[in-house]
C-alpha cells in the first residue's frame, strides 16, 4: 500500500490513528492537521511512529524559529528579488504546481557578498510556503487534493563558479531543511540541459537527499522538451521549455513568473569576502615553495581550493606530474594552471579546476621570488567526485 489517503493497509491506518493521538497537543498549530498532512510525516519515516513524531515536533520548532506563520508577509532584500533565479509557472497534467530553478545565471559571489546566508535560506523557505499555498489553491480549484510539486532544474550554464564552497554549503543546508521540514512534497525533480559538471554537483548534494528524493530525480537527455511534455501540457509549459505558454507580451521565457537572475552589480555588495575556516596552515620560507599532491583516478573530477596568505602576496599554480614517486620542480611538470602571484593577504583566493585526465596533480604555493620574507599560507583543498550513476544522464522520462 502507498501509505496515502485511500490506500492504507490496516496496520498503516492503525499507525495513523495512534500518530494523531500522540501529537494532538500540536494539532491546532499545524498548517493543516488533516490525514494528508499527517501521512506525509509517517511516509517520510516509513511509518515508524517514534521517528515520525520526533520529525513532526522538530518541524514545529522550525516553524517557530523561522516564523513560518508570517513568512509570506516578509519581503526578501532587493538583491534577492532582482537576482535570485526561479519561479512558479504552470501546472503538470495532474494539476500539481511546477517550480523552475534556473542555475546558469546565478551569481554565487554576488549573492553572498550582498546578502546574508540567513536571508537566502529564509527566501528559500518562503518559496516553499508559496508553493504549498499554491497546492492548497489548486486543491480548491480542482476539487481534489494536490499535495506534491514538480521541480525543473535548468542546468544550462552550470559551471565552476557554481562550485564555490560558500554557495555549495548554503544549498546543502537548504536541501537538508527541505528533507526535514517539507517531506513527501516532491513529485519529480526534472533536470534539463545537464552539463558535464552536473554529476559533480549532484554528488555534492546527494548526502543531503533521502533515498526517496533521489529516486524522484530524473535527468532528461537531448529530447528533454519531449520529456517535459509528457508531464506538462503545452499550454502550461513556457515556450522556452518546449511548450506554448508565453507572457502577455509574447516573451517565451515567462519573465513575469520566472526570474532569470543575472550578475549582481558590485555597487550592491555589502562585503568583499566571506569568512572561511581553513583546514591547513604552512610556513613557506623565503626563496622556497610548498607542494600539495592529489591523485585523480579518472577524468571529470573537480579540484577546488581556497587560500589566504599573511602579510604579503603568494604565488600559486597547478601542475600535473610527469614522473611518479618523486618530487618534481615546476619546470619538470606539465602546466595546468600557470603560476601567478595573488594578493591573497588582501582578499582570500578561491578557484576550481576540472581535471581532464587522471594523474597526480600538484598545487604549488610559490615563495621563490621573495628573498626577504617567509609567508604563512592557510588553505583548504578538496577533490569533488562525479556521481557514477549520474555520469550517463540519458534516461527517458516515464511518468509514474
From Swiss-Prot:
Keyword Disulfide bond listed: no
Keyword set, alphabetical order: Lipid-binding, Transport
Domain named GOLD: residues: 275-383
One Pfam family per UniProt: CRAL_TRIO
Keyword Transport listed: yes
A single GO cellular-component term on record: cytoplasm
Biological role stated in the UniProt entry: Probable hydrophobic ligand-binding protein; may play a role in the transport of hydrophobic ligands like tocopherol, squalene and phospholipids.
GO function term, MF aspect, one: lipid binding
Segments forming domain CRAL-TRIO: 76-249
Entry protein name: SEC14-like protein 3
